[in-house]
């Protein structure tokens, strides 16, 4: 059984259900959204839930279900994840109808490009936890996604796609939003932005990680 910090707030039977029935589905996804990714989101969600006094079972379930919609089209995966929550009657063992509604909405609200603030503290927790903003992890994930989805591109093509994605999502005018004040992600996002503003340095990082991922 995978142990996270702050696990004391999660029911053991819920944990067993998630680890045997839900998490294995992430093995079918790309490297940027695999089992390691969802485990990281769970760990960060539980830490934030404890800090904010939120329910551990709720935060755990939301994190576990948040990307299941990647079994369908990526562009609407957050909405598909919400439908998966709503249709999974097994959740009634641990949660009331109202709690399941909140779980569904939080899963729908987790996406970085969402134009509105998450509707509950749980949506803010999973949205924040989904942002693993360690700079090297962000850069590596972006390269991995490009290699997986655009295998026809050469290194220069991947660099141009990488740079465009950095500008659109992570730059000072990018669409990423942080919903929890003074979270650990704020400092990490600033480090990413500093590198975006220094393209020659960013290219060195890209070339190193690209070489590692294509070795």
Feature map (PLM): residue ranges:
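Short, well-structured alpha-helical segments
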Residues: 35, 39-42, 60, 97-108
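Hydrophobic, well-structured mid-protein blocks that either form specific transmembrane helices
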Residues: 83-119
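Small/polar-rich, solvent-exposed N-terminal microdomains that initiate assembly or binding
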Residues: 19-28
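Divalent metal-dependent phosphate-bond-processing catalytic cores, especially two-metal-ion Mg2+/Mn2+ enzymes
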Residues: 2, 6-9, 27-52, 65, ...
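An amphipathic alpha-helix signature
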Residues: 11-19, 42, 58, 82-86, ...
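An active-site-proximal "capping" alpha-helix that borders the catalytic cofactor pocket
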Residues: 41, 45, 76-91
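Short helix-loop boundary/capping segments at the starts of domains
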Residues: 47-54, 70, 74, 90-91
């Amino acid at each position: 059984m995978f142990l996270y910090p702050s696990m004391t707030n999660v029911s053991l039977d819920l944990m067993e259900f998630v680890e045997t029935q839900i998490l294995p589905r992430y093995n079918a996804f790309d490297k940027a959204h695999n089992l390691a990714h969802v485990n990281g989101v769970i760990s960060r969600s539980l830490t934030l839930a404890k800090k904010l006094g939120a329910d551990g079972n709720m935060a755990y379930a939301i994190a576990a279900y948040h990307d299941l919609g990647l079994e369908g089209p990526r562009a609407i995966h957050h909405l598909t994840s919400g439908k998966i929550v709503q249709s999974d009657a097994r959740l009634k063992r641990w949660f009331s109808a109202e709690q399941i509604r909140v779980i569904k909405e939080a899963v729908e609200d987790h996406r970085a490009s969402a134009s509105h603030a998450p509707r509950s503290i749980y949506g803010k927790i999973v949205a924040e936890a989904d942002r693993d903003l360690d700079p090297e992890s962000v850069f590596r994930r972006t390269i991995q996604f490009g290699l997986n989805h655009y295998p026809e591109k050469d290194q220069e093509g991947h660099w141009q796609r990488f740079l465009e994605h950095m500008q659109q999502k992570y730059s000072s005018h990018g669409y990423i939003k942080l919903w929890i004040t003074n979270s650990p992600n704020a400092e990490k996002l600033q480090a990413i932005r500093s590198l975006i503003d220094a393209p020659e340095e960013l290219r060195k990082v890209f070339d190193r990680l690209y070489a590692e991922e294509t070795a």
